[in-house]
Regions:
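Small cysteine-rich, disulfide-bonded extracellular modules of the LU/uPAR three-finger superfamily
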Residues: 1-85, 89-133
Length: 133
């Protein structure tokens, strides 16, 4: 049987993610397949780089932690199809979270996966859910 955690423990674990990454997190949306893990080299073309708000995730509740504030870029970096994202600390080098990008059924929901250089776009939904929430 897998370990089970209380809602209180799950919420604390989720809140620790934002604390560990810091208040100046950087989101990069990329083309191509998601790397094997956060320790693997970056892959794909960077379509957008977003400096996230200083309080970029809401407080965890009921075993889930959702994005906070507006996550938007007024000018995409390149043209291509968004397929995955990585969240880095303020240095923009160390990956701490990664996942898929799409308009539905993915880890991060965006308004459009077809990026054109200089286009504006918005991240609609991003929520981290604890494993047994």
């Amino acid at each position: 049987m897998a370990l089970q955690y209380s809602v209180t423990v799950n919420n604390a674990r989720l809140d620790a993610i934002e604390t560990a990454i810091g208040t100046s997190a950087i989101l990069k949306i990329r083309t191509g397949a998601v790397p094997a893990n956060c320790g693997a080299a970056d892959s794909g073309t960077v379509l957008a780089t977003v400096n996230l708000p200083s309080d970029w995730m809401a407080a965890a509740a009921s075993g889930a932690k959702a994005k906070s504030g507006t996550w938007q870029d007024t000018s995409a970096d390149a043209t291509g199809t968004a397929a995955h994202f990585r969240v880095y600390d303020s240095g923009g080098v160390t990956c701490h979270i990664q996942g898929t990008v799409g308009t539905s059924g993915t880890d991060m929901i965006v308004d459009n996966t077809s990026f054109a250089a200089t286009q504006s776009f918005t991240i609609n939904t991003f929520t981290i859910t604890a494993s047994n929430a």
